[in-house]
């Protein structure tokens, strides 16, 4: 299986990499949050742009991206607008969503973009090609904050992302029971062993699913999300605790 290298970080080998999400509403809070995050122990900085108020002003969005780049130049920067339908803060049109991601790609400030699988097949394929032409990696994602589908469906979605040439397919699902967590882990393992030719990221959310955020190296998830301050999704644990557990499991 091929790995994905962003800056000096190799994703898809060793312990799962830690991603943290920065959620700030304006330039001033982007700056202050970035300074606080700079001291934390993590691998990839995700900027959750859907929390940013001045979204219609592309210059303002890119000015904020520039601050993040300048504050943490060595950290891979993942640009993510999470749509309202997949658990994000704002709803925008598909056209605006694609335009925003293209602007991020054009800026030269971001290393990776998050692209939701169910945006529309043609738009997704075109945006992946555009990102790759500009040396930007794509994390292709799907989130369900209500339920966990059958393992076959989880695998089908991850394989579809892979067929669309995502660098890293990602799926996050809400368990309604502990057996749903096992479904997610079994699907992850089957995907990783039988179909994946690149790193994947999977997680089961909320307190019930916490084990999935810790056991990625065992089942085949290449990265996990931790919290510096406020969790960006239910079930995230602090980066310091997360690193400790991931290291213990890696060295066992």
From Swiss-Prot:
Organism this protein belongs to: Escherichia coli O17:K52:H18 (strain UMN026 / ExPEC)
InterPro entries associated with the record: 3-dehydroquinate_DH_AS, Aldolase_TIM, DHquinase_I, Type-I_3-dehydroquinase
UniProt xrefs under PROSITE patterns: DEHYDROQUINASE_I (PS01028)
Entry function: Involved in the third step of the chorismate pathway, which leads to the biosynthesis of aromatic amino acids. Catalyzes the cis-dehydration of 3-dehydroquinate (DHQ) and introduces the first double bond of the aromatic ring to yield 3-dehydroshikimate.
Listed EC numbers: 4.2.1.10
Catalytic site positions: 143 (proton donor/acceptor), 170 (schiff-base intermediate with substrate)
Listed Gene3D superfamilies: Aldolase class I
Pathway connected to this protein: Metabolic intermediate biosynthesis; chorismate biosynthesis; chorismate from D-erythrose 4-phosphate and phosphoenolpyruvate: step 3/7
Highest classification ranks of the organism: Bacteria, Pseudomonadati, Pseudomonadota, Gammaproteobacteria, Enterobacterales
Annotated catalysed reactions: 3-dehydroquinate = 3-dehydroshikimate + H2O
The protein's name in its UniProt record: 3-dehydroquinate dehydratase
Keywords: Amino-acid biosynthesis, Aromatic amino acid biosynthesis, Lyase, Schiff base
GO biological process: 3,4-dihydroxybenzoate biosynthetic process; amino acid biosynthetic process; aromatic amino acid family biosynthetic process; chorismate biosynthetic process
HAMAP family reported in the protein's UniProt record: AroD
UniProt xrefs under NCBIfam families: aroD
Signal peptide: none
């Amino acid at each position: 299986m091929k790995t994905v290298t962003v800056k000096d970080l190799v994703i898809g080998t060793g312990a799962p990499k830690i991603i943290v999400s920065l959620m700030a509403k304006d330039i001033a809070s982007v700056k202050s949050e970035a300074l606080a995050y700079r001291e934390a122990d993590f691998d990839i900085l995700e900027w959750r742009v859907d929390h940013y108020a001045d979204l219609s002003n592309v210059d303002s969005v890119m000015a904020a991206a520039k601050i993040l780049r300048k504050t943490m130049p060595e950290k891979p920067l993942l640009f993510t607008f999470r749509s309202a339908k997949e658990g994000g803060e704002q709803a925008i049109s598909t056209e605006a969503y694609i335009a925003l991601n293209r602007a991020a790609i054009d800026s030269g400030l971001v290393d990776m973009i998050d692209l939701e699988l169910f945006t529309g097949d043609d738009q997704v394929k075109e945006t992946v090609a555009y990102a790759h032409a500009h040396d930007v990696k794509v994390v292709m994602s799907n989130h369900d904050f209500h339920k966990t589908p059958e393992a076959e469906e989880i695998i089908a979605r991850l394989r579809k992302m892979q067929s669309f040439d995502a660098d890293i397919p990602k799926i996050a699902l809400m368990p309604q029971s502990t057996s749903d967590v096992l479904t997610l882990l079994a699907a992850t393992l089957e995907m990783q062993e039988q179909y994946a030719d690149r790193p994947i990221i999977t997680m089961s959310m909320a307190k019930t699913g916490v084990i999935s955020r810790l056991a990625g190296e065992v089942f085949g998830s290449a990265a996990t999300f931790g919290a510096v301050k406020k969790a960006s999704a239910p079930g995230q644990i602090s980066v310091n605790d997360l690193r400790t557990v991931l290291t213990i499991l890696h060295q066992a």
